Amino acid sequence: MNVKGFRFSAVEAAIKKPGRLDLALICSDAPAAVAAVYTTNKVKAAPVLLDMERTTSGTCRAVVVNSGNANACTGDRGMEDARETTSLVAERIGASEHEVLVCSTGVIGVPLPMERIRGGIPSLVAGLGSATLDQIAAAIMTTDTFPKLEARTGTAGGVGYTIAGIAKGAGMIMPNMATMLAFVVTDAAVDPQWLDRVFRRANDTSFNAITVDGDMSTNDTAIIMANGAAGNPVLSEGSEGAAEFAVLLEEVLLSLAKLIVKDGEGATKFVEVTVKGARSDADAKRAAMAVANSCLVKTAFFGQDANWGRIFAAVGYSGADVEPDRAELFFDDVRMVQGGVFAGGDAEARGTGVLRKKEFTVTVDLHLGDGRATVYTSDLSYDYVKINADYRT
């Protein structure tokens, strides 16, 4: 996939197991507008803290990413290692150190193997242009089972452009952000301040609307770079083509977010949870996330048990305003609850049939207002426990 003005590279630096790409570089030939969102965990990894400082400038040349080590909870050394990594890249691409961002993912509490990173960076930079975005997606994987890539094309002022994104993440996935990294590149010319706003809006309905296990990581980062190489008139609030760009960006991020859930550790189901008729959108999101994060609900999904009571209970303890005798609950189009009680008839059998599917929807209508939210989740299987019990061994 070609995105004008961007080059990619990935190498094996022996950070992960032998034979796996684990050091990647995304580089723009010219300074690019940049926006980013980060984990809300109060325990933030060194690369997150460094990037938070640097993205305030609104411009960026490159992002270097390692997988296999999170560089989190590593003290002063962790920050020194993050800075050195960006410095080594910057001097080889002819950029300021402050124009280079760094991301890490992997085991927490272990210092970066800097001798391996130092050894890998010369070939990483020399190989710019030799890798595809698919290979970068593979290089940033940890417990993922497949690389995640999505792209869209659009036009602005009669000029075509591309938006392409990659992501990783399969566990510790819950808003806001989670063990997930996402990188979006576009050759569209975009005003930096508007890019920041539109990127945050798109994140709210995508990466901040997914959960696999309710855990929040120390490293989560989503970055977008827009280098203007397409040559379109600069996109900004209300400009021609701005609305289309915003829609396409949201489509890319939502598709990546769904792929993360589908690749959830041990996941066998993909479930869309919608709460509507709430007092507010915030109430709806609160209730939907309570359902999507409930271990009892998720194990019922895995067991294909139409246990609507667990869902109803999760809505009740979510903190959202609920009047039980008004509520309805559906599995796909099968009404399981009406007026706060079991719908009766053949609902149990039909609901069980829905839960046998790989993908289905759960809809709760509170009948209290116009608030609405949708989140995406998976089931919780035996394999999730095994994957995470064995993670460091």
UniProtKB/Swiss-Prot annotation:
Reactions catalysed, as given in the entry: N(2)-acetyl-L-ornithine + L-glutamate = N-acetyl-L-glutamate + L-ornithine; L-glutamate + acetyl-CoA = N-acetyl-L-glutamate + CoA + H(+)
Active-site residues, Swiss-Prot/TrEMBL: 179
GO molecular function, one term: L-glutamate N-acetyltransferase activity
Record EC number: 2.3.1.35, 2.3.1.1
Subcellular location: Cytoplasm
Site positions for Cleavage: 178-179
InterPro entries in the cross-refs: Arg_biosynth_ArgJ, ArgJ-like_dom_sf, ArgJ_beta_C
A GO biological process held by the record: L-arginine biosynthetic process
Origin superkingdom: Bacteria
Record site feature (Involved in the stabilization of negative charge on the oxyanion by the formation of the oxyanion hole), residues: 105-106
Keyword set, alphabetical order: Acyltransferase, Amino-acid biosynthesis, Arginine biosynthesis, Autocatalytic cleavage, Cytoplasm, Multifunctional enzyme, Transferase
Residue sites binding substrate per the record: 142, 168, 179, 265, 388, 393
Pathway in which the depicted protein is active: Amino-acid biosynthesis; L-arginine biosynthesis; L-ornithine and N-acetyl-L-glutamate from L-glutamate and N(2)-acetyl-L-ornithine (cyclic): step 1/1; Amino-acid biosynthesis; L-arginine biosynthesis; N(2)-acetyl-L-ornithine from L-glutamate: step 1/4
GO cellular component terms attached to this protein's record: cytoplasm
Subunit structure, interactors included: Heterotetramer of two alpha and two beta chains.
Physiological role: Catalyzes two activities which are involved in the cyclic version of arginine biosynthesis: the synthesis of N-acetylglutamate from glutamate and acetyl-CoA as the acetyl donor, and of ornithine by transacetylation between N(2)-acetylornithine and glutamate.
Family designation: Belongs to the ArgJ family.
Protein's recorded name: Arginine biosynthesis bifunctional protein ArgJ
Source species of the chain: Geobacter sulfurreducens (strain ATCC 51573 / DSM 12127 / PCA)
